Amino acid sequence: MAVPKRRKSKSKVRTKRAHHAIGKPNLVPCPNCNVYRLPHRICPTCGFYKTGIVLEPKVKKPKEEN
């Protein structure tokens, strides 16, 4: 079974992991409502995609008290 010949130092390990960071998401404004959304996806606020409204946005109903 293979075993490392030398122990990796902290700086070597951390240098290798320097490229593992998560990048920030690429956001684009919705052409209909100007809210930022992910590209190539339906707008979560208005339901607009490319040429028209694909989904009707969900409207939250207020809770009724008993």
Swiss-Prot record:
Key word Ribosomal protein present: yes
GO biological process, one term: translation
Spans annotated as Disordered: 1-20
Domain of life: Bacteria
GO molecular function, one term: structural constituent of ribosome
Record's keyword terms, sorted: Ribonucleoprotein, Ribosomal protein
Protein name: Large ribosomal subunit protein bL32
Organism this protein belongs to: Leptospira borgpetersenii serovar Hardjo-bovis (strain JB197)
Gene coding for it: rpmF
